Amino acid sequence: MLHTTVPPAIVIRAGGVACILLAMLVTSSHATDANPLTAPWQGPFGGVPPFDGVRVEHVAPALEAGMAEQLAAVERIAADPAPPTFDNTIAAFERSGRLLDRVMTVYGVLTGSLSDDALRAVEREMAPRLAAFQDAIVQNERLFARITAVHEGAEAAGLSPEQRRLAWLHATNLARAGARLDTRAKAELAAINQELATLHTTFAQNVLVEESDTAVFLDHEADLAGVPETARRAAADAAVARGRKGAWAIPNTRSSVEPFLTFADRRDLRERVWRMFVDRGDRGNAADNNGVVTRILALRARRAALLGFPTHAHWRLEDSMAKTPERAVALMEAVWKPAVARVREEVADMQAVADAEGAGITIAAWDYRYYAEKVRRARYDLDEAELAPYLQLDRLRDGMFFVAERLFGLRFEPLGVGEVPVFHPDVRVWRVADAGGETVGLWYFDPFARTGKRSGAWMSDYRPQERLDGRVLPLVSNNCNFVKPATGEPALLSWDDATTLFHEFGHALHGLCSDVAHPSLAGTRVARDYVELPSQLLEHWLSTPEVLERFAVHCETGRPIPAELVARIRRADAFNQGFRTVEFLGSALVDMRLHLAGAAPIDPERFERQTLETLGMPVEIVMRHRTPHFNHIFADDGYSAGYYSYLWADMLTADAWGAFGEAGGPWDADVAGRLRRHVLSAGNTIDPEEGYRRFRGRDPSIDALLRKRGFAPAVKPRSDLD
């Protein structure tokens, strides 16, 4: 999320930038005094973020200074008496906002990884002000006219393909954000955007509070029967951190909850932990998000109508690969039926195990992971507890580096402690170099969960690659929520955690391999349903023999993972895919239908329940993200009507992985070169469909996706997705 400051008394209106700028310059006249956030980044590698010197009181003044600087730059562009050209308009617009970009980088890290009450107060103050600031730029009619003139004028024919793409992108983005609306509509749109910014912040903060402040406490070690020793120690440490030494705590985060649900023998405690987790944001307390969701949906529907779209979903997907909600839904429905059929088989297998044990139960949602693990042990002689000692975080991280070097010639060299500032002692930094030793960028890694850090895993782009005014190195980070081990012990991952590790590293490589001139087109700044292609594709290298045999070594003996265990892992590759697919699609289809519903008031709980009933959601599975804590779609606009993107990208991923198979294996240099050239390095300089065709030689097919997940052939013909 972005957070910026505009004096709340200012009314945003078309052509009102000068008034806003004047007010902001007054409020921020002392913003740069001894403030590390407003100074150019110092240090090696073209400068690095000043994480070590920032305090919460620096944030608001720095944001004000950044906005004032960008608004002044925009006003100069808009008021330029010279005819609009690429250099004096498009390139100048690219250069505007560099100070604000630097401030927002650090601010985003603070609010996402080190949040506390003081920062949350700043977030609440800043959210609507940033929205107003953004609208002030969008609604500058002279700026839009100049950008459109370059995009549509005679000069466009003489621009490079990347320059034409950039001019098109800025003109399109401004138009989609309301630049063509009349004065009254612009005023209403600005008010909507400011309220939405506040609501998005409220939603995310409520989820963070629920995750940080709630846990299930266990008073007897017998309550952890079946739970691996590493998870027990983590639970004991979590209890100590919460003032309950001698007890055990299961925090309300996925990294703690899922291992408990997988291994804990006590069914009543599994249910208790499960309910804590799935009811985040839905408890009727101060952090309940249902009312927030209702209002967000209403405002999004109204905004879409103002912008000339039938629904929010139609607006969001216009610039995606899918293009329309109908195409996205067609893909989801093509996968839904075989996935549900597979779930029926999985549940039957689990019920048979429970019956054989004399459990006297009917499989419920809090039983799924537990009995699925039993089925996997019985069918494939494979279980998480056997795998975990081989999945050491540090060694698998080295395995990722091995993949990056072998495929793309990138080498990762650790920097010493204190060589560049970091925001927490857990964070480490690596210099990334090409085959010739030249620095490509920096990779920051923040692996462990902690209080004040939002849940999940993500890649952050501290600074995009560019060469508009000289070569600028990208600075990227991967952020995870793995359970931190006790001092002196290795961090051991589940297979899912290891997959997440490789997934996020795929995003990092997308940023590090970027090779474009303009920052707005760099790295991961691509369509939402395309950006997951590099990340999901890199997951495949985790299970290659070359990675497992070298880097999956036992934490005590140091011996590599046995070949027969690797064979069992590969045989179990499609295991439990019904569950994984249905829990995802439940969330993705509810997301899409919420945003196709139009302007009618929505009760989130009722809508979710009725939608899942209509779909035929198996009762043994709950959505991966229930509506009241669905940060992807309600903490900002990011994945709203776009959670399907992971499936769309996985269709591309399965098809792209096939290119390596057709060429003889995962290390084929020619295929890797095409992947880097046409996908990773190209950023948004070309249309993603064209970029994929250049890499693959054709359009993708859904059949590879269904084969990957172990499902039947496509239910719908490929033409339904065209």
Language-model features, listed with the residues they occupy:
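Intrinsically disordered or highly flexible coil/loop and linker segments, enriched in small
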Residues: A68, A72, R76-P83, L99-D116, ...
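Short His/Asp/Glu-rich catalytic/ion-coordination signatures at enzyme active sites or charged loops
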Residues: G43-H58, Y107-M126, A149-A191, P251-G291, ...
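Active-site-proximal, well-structured secondary-structure segments within enzyme catalytic domains
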Residues: E162, L166-W168, T198, Q205, ...
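N-terminal helix-rich structural modules
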Residues: T4, T32-R233, D722
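N-terminal secretory signal peptides that target proteins for export/translocation
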Residues: M1-I12
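Bacterial N-terminal signal peptides
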Residues: G15-T27
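C-terminal, non-catalytic "cap/extension" segments appended to globular domains
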Residues: T32-G53, H58, A65, A247-A249, ...
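Short pre-active-site segment immediately N-terminal to the catalytic Zn-binding motif
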Residues: V483-L501
